[in-house]
Amino acid sequence: MKKYILLLLLIPVLSFSQNLKSFISKDSTEIFYEDIGKGKTLVILSGGPGLNSDYLKEFYDTVSKKYRCIILHQRGTGKSILKKVNKETVNVNRYIEDLNGLYKALGNKKLTLVGHSWGGMLSFSYAANESDKIEKIILLNTGGITEKFHTWFGSNMNMR
């Protein structure tokens, strides 16, 4: 009976780990992502920066019934742990490098990015730098980027 109960407790853990994958980013950070569902691929980028994607679970569980959802654990969130958190390890250029690593891990196919809040702003930044790697961008509650916001955001990131 104990073995049966243990098996029941391990099933969710084992099924989660089968969907969890990783790649090594340009700065040697291991970046994790979940791969769930089948169909056209959507890369889901959570808000923050620094916010774990768990708050979007109901969304991507629903969407994964029709699409393949790649849920990126952005650096410093989820399983993508950083040894140090500072302006060298957490900045827009590093996030863009991470998306390039994901692009390669997914077979160099154009990405459809689904960005919520900060994830949408990251989608904008990625598209501005790597437009040849983008198929579509879907924005959810994302603010627009003005020169004033860009200056504020850069200052805010540099203070971290």
Model-derived regions: residue spans:
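Glycine-rich His-Gly loop
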Residues: I44-G48, S117, T142
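Active-site loop/oxyanion-hole signature of alpha/beta-hydrolase fold enzymes
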Residues: Q74-V114
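Flexible "cap/lid" loop of the alpha/beta hydrolase fold
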Residues: I138-R160
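Bacterial Sec-dependent N-terminal signal peptides
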Residues: M1-L20
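Short glycine-enriched nucleophile-adjacent loop
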Residues: G120-S131, I137
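Conserved HGGG/HGGXW glycine-rich cap/lid loop of the alpha/beta-hydrolase fold
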Residues: S25-L82, N86
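Residue in the alpha/beta-hydrolase core beta-strand immediately N-terminal to the catalytic nucleophile
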Residues: T112, E135-I138
